[in-house]
Amino acid sequence: MPRASAAQTTSQARRRTGPAPCRLASPSVTDVAPLATLLDLRPLGDDAFTAPTHGPDAGVERVYGGHVAAQALLAATRTVPADRSAHSVHLAFVRSGRPGLPVRLDVTRDRDGRSFATRRVTVRQEDAVIMEMMASFHVEEPGDDWTATPILDVPGPEETPGRSFLHELPTLGVFDWRVTGETVPGEMDATYPHWVRTVEALPDDPAVHRAVVCGMTDIAAVRGTMRPGFERGEGGFTGASLDHAVWFHRPARADEWMLFTMDSMSNHAARGFGIGRAWSADGRHIASWAQESLIRHHGGAE
C-alpha cells in the first residue's frame, strides 16, 4: 500500500490538511474557468446541450480534451435512467478545440435495453466536429469483486510536490497533480505514477465524479505514451491525444486523492500507445484506460 493516509470523511476535511495544491499562473487568470463552470451544461432541447470553454486569454492555444470528455460524458449521462452508470467510454479526438468558444453536445440514443444503454455524443464548435464519444451504461449487478494488480508502493501525495512544468498548461490548474516515483528526476519512466484530485470540492453526484475522472485520465496521457527515458529537456515536441478509451470499475470521488499510472507500451511512426490505471488512496482499482497519442518531435514532417 502507498504511504498515503486513508480517505477522510469528507473532501472538505481533506482540503484543510497537507500542503497547498500546485496552483498555476496564467496570462489571464480570470480566463481559466473553475471546474464547476466548465461542467455547467445548458440544455438546448432534443438531447442537445451547450457548455463553455476556457477564455481566449487563458494562456493555451487549444481546449484541453479532458474537459470536453467530461462534458460529453455528463451530456450522455443526462439522457439515461438514474439506475445506470457509465462503465466504458470511447473517444475520438477529431480536431483541436478553440478556447473562448462554447461547445455544442448532441446526444444520440443508440440503445436502451434492460441492463445497458448506449449513447453517442458529437461535440462541435461552430459546426466543426472536435470530438466523438461512444459511452455504455450498465445497471449495477451482483458479481465477483477482485483486482489482479495492487496499487503501487510509492510516496503518498502529501510527500510529493506539484510539478512545475504544468505552467505550460495553465488550464490544468483545476487539478492538483503530483508526479511521484521517478527513478531519475526529469526523465520519463516506463510507468508514470502520479497523484491527482480536483482543487475544488465537487458535489456529491456520482455522475459528476465519474465524468471528471474520465477527463482526468487525459491529463498525463501524452507524456505517459512517450518512450521511457525521454528527458523533458532534450528537445521540443508536439503532442496530442488521438483516441482514448476508459473503463470504470468502481465508484470514486474525483476531489479525493487517486493514484494514476501510465505504462508506455509502444512508439512508432510519431505515435505512442500507453495503458493507464487509477486507484483510490485506500487501494481500490477505480478505472483503466488506453490511449494513442501523436508525438511529433520538432524537426519532423508538418
For the regions a language model picked out, list residue spans one by one.
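Short alpha-helix boundary/capping segments
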Residues: 2-11
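Terminal targeting signals and extreme-terminal segments of soluble enzymes
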Residues: 22-302
